[in-house]
């Protein structure tokens, strides 16, 4: 059976891992790195993913997509302010969804994320020597139903069978607690590139039980970067009266410099930011440069409100779990942004514990996902591990007066199922519309509507007489299904989401086909590049042979040089048949040249030996063993 993998599909970077010999191991990518930037770039028909995409971002800002996880499964009205700060075009799509426009074509965030997944799985398949089809993918614990569905769809578009969608902090706890014995209560503090989660778990006897979770899906390292971007832009504007954020290329350079400065300030008290030729004076066309020094103290001042936002979810999670700082055995830090010194100080202040840094914050989530994949596949090395997770937000329906009637409250263990009986509000009401809500506010309008569906065909009866059985069913992925049944007639309806941010089945199928076609095109493109490279290498080898064999007959050198020149022209062309034809001729000419010179060299060597025949036509090539002086 092919191995299943665990994937941390991150905002900034992504990681893939697999169980090997009872232990989860990170699989390095084709470039030899353990993390892959979650960056996708489009250049004509070509797609670049990972580090190669990140490297060309400054020159291709409008077609280089990053931090797309912040848009996945969300509505346009939730992200339009964030979208305005992006170097690429993010706009409203069908039904209030989000789309990213590149060169006149619209992409769903799920499609872009699928490219990252395809790169991870493709590289891992090559490393493992087997095609990977099954995966566990992680999501922030505070992701809502739409975001979870969209993440699962990204996996399907990438050609994966998504075994499970699990929460990132829970996965990190699996990685941490895999080989630990005894009972522990731990707090996982997960501050990544775009999201923030806090989860409290109890560990013991192979059981990982989540007691509470809280978070903020709009808080992460990118927000800290943005504060540096804004500061740099405002400082430059004061000096030159020009807002760099209006120049897409300059903005991309600011974003890259801000992230670099943030990372450096984790280990240094100040850092220099140098961006020469950041733009040109609009009047004189002389180049303008940006030079600034940013201290850690100034960085903490710029991000003071973000640091304050970190506190509330920690306090909420501890309150919901009914634990105090003295009840916590360990505090685990996950996510690259936990390296920020001010964040570590806040964690210590809130929990009274020195954070445990024994797990790699960049890899722990993927490692835990690999453990979950192993559990699902029945890996005998893992023993009896039981994972009990919870739903992060309250789920309910809208009732009379615009209120929310909770069905499943936050921090309920999943999978979970709950049924309630509702009735009609008016006489002879022929049907009801059920508005499914997610959130903690008492009024329906203040919570997120996951979707609406109708139950028709209710027989005429007085208000309050109809009995409508509504069932909420959350699966192990945290994904919700809702059904409604009128008990008198037995009529039943299940949720059909209207104006959803997720894709319908036909969209997913179309995108899967597109992704497969793209993969075939990518393979063909790679093969063409490899053929060009092979011809170019042979051309270089031919020129080296000419240089190294100066005494060779001039006509032989001229013939080889002529075909080598043809090869140079063919490499620069887009004609595959010409490349193949020239390669065949160059191969033959080079072989003849090397054979002729090898024979000539052997003849010269023989002529230099005592008693050798003077007629080169009589020379016989042979391998002689050295004489043994002792015989």
From Swiss-Prot:
Residue spans of biased composition, Basic and acidic residues class: 622-631
Purpose: Acts as a chaperone.
Inducers of expression: By stress conditions e.g. heat shock.
Organism: Deinococcus proteolyticus (strain ATCC 35074 / DSM 20540 / JCM 6276 / NBRC 101906 / NCIMB 13154 / VKM Ac-1939 / CCM 2703 / MRP)
Protein name, entry field: Chaperone protein DnaK
Annotated region described as Disordered, given as residue ranges: 593-631
Family to which this protein belongs: Belongs to the heat shock protein 70 family.
GO molecular function: ATP binding; ATP-dependent protein folding chaperone; unfolded protein binding
InterPro entries, A to Z: ATPase_NBD, Chaperone_DnaK, Heat_shock_70_CS, HSP70_peptide-bd_sf, Hsp_70_fam
UniProtKB keywords: ATP-binding, Chaperone, Nucleotide-binding, Phosphoprotein, Stress response
HAMAP family, per database record: DnaK
UniProt modified residues of type Phosphothreonine: 195
Biased composition (Low complexity): 599-614
Top-level division of the source organism's lineage: Bacteria
């Amino acid at each position: 059976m092919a191995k299943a993998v665990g994937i941390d599909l991150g905002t900034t970077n992504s990681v893939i891992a697999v169980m090997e010999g009872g232990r989860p191991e990170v699989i390095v990518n084709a470039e030899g790195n353990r993390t892959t930037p979650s960056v996708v770039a489009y250049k004509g028909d070509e797609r670049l993913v990972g580090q190669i995409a990140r490297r060309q971002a400054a020159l291709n800002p409008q077609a280089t997509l990053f931090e797309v996880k912040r848009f996945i499964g969300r509505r346009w009205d939730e992200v339009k302010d964030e979208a305005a700060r992006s170097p690429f075009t993010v706009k409203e799509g069908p039904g209030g969804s989000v789309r990213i426009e590149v060169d006149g074509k619209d992409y769903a965030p799920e499609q872009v994320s699928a490219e990252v997944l395809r790169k991870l799985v493709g590289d891992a398949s090559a490393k493992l020597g087997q095609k990977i089809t099954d995966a566990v993918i992680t999501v922030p614990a505070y992701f809502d139903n739409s975001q979870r569905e969209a993440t699962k769809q990204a996996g399907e578009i990438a050609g994966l069978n998504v075994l499970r969608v699990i929460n990132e902090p829970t996965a990190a706890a699996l990685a941490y607690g895999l080989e630990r014995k005894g009972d522990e209560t731990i707090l996982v503090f997960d501050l990544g590139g775009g999201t923030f989660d806090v989860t409290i778990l109890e560990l013991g006897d192979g059981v990982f039980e989540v007691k509470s979770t809280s978070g903020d899906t709009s808080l992460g390292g990118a927000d800290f970067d943005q504060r540096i971007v804004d500061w740099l832009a405002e400082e430059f504007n004061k000096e030159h009266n020009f807002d760099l954020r209006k120049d897409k290329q300059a903005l991309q350079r600011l974003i890259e410099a801000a992230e670099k400065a943030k990372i450096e300030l984790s280990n240094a008290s100040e850092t220099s930011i140098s961006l020469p030729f950041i733009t040109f004076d609009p009047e004189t066309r002389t180049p303008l440069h940006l030079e600034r020094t940013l201290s850690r103290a100034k960085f903490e001042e710029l991000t003071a409100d973000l640091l304050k936002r970190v506190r509330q979810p920690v306090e909420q999670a501890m309150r919901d779990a009914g634990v105090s700082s003295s009840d916590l055995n360990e505090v685990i830090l996950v996510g690259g942004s936990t390296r920020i010194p001010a964040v570590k100080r806040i964690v210590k202040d809130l929990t009274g514990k020195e954070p445990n840094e024994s797990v790699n914050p960049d890899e722990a989530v993927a490692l835990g996902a690999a453990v979950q994949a192993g559990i699902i596949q029945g890996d005998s090395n893992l023993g009896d591990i039981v994972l009990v997770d919870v739903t992060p937000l309250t789920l309910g329906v809208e009732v009379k007066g615009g209120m929310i009637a909770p069905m499943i409250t936050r921090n309920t263990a999943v999978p979970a199922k709950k049924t309630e009986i509702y009735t009609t509000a008016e006489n002879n009401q022929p049907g009801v519309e059920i508005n499914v809500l997610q959130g903690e506010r008492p009024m329906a309008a203040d919570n997120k509507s996951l979707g609406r569906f109708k139950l028709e065909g209710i027989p005429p009866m007085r208000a309050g007489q109809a009995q409508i059985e509504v069932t909420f069913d959350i699966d192990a992925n945290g994904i919700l299904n809702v059904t409604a049944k009128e008990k008198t007639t037995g009529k039943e309806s299940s949720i059909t989401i209207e104006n959803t941010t997720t894709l319908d089945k036909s969209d997913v199928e179309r995108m899967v086909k597109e992704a497969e076609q793209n993969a075939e095109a990518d393979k063909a493109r790679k093969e063409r590049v490899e053929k060009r490279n092979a011809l170019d290498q042979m051309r270089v080898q031919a020129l080296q042979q000419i240089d190294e064999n100066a005494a060779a007959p001039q006509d032989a050198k001229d013939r080889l040089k002529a075909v080598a020149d043809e090869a140079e022209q063919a490499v620069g062309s887009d004609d595959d048949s010409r490349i193949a034809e020239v390669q065949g001729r160059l191969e033959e000419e080079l072989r003849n040249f090397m054979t002729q010179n090898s024979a000539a060299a052997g003849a010269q060597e023989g002529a230099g030996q005592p008693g050798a025949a003077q007629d080169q036509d009589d020379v016989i090539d042979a391998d002689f063993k050295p004489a043994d002086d002792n015989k």
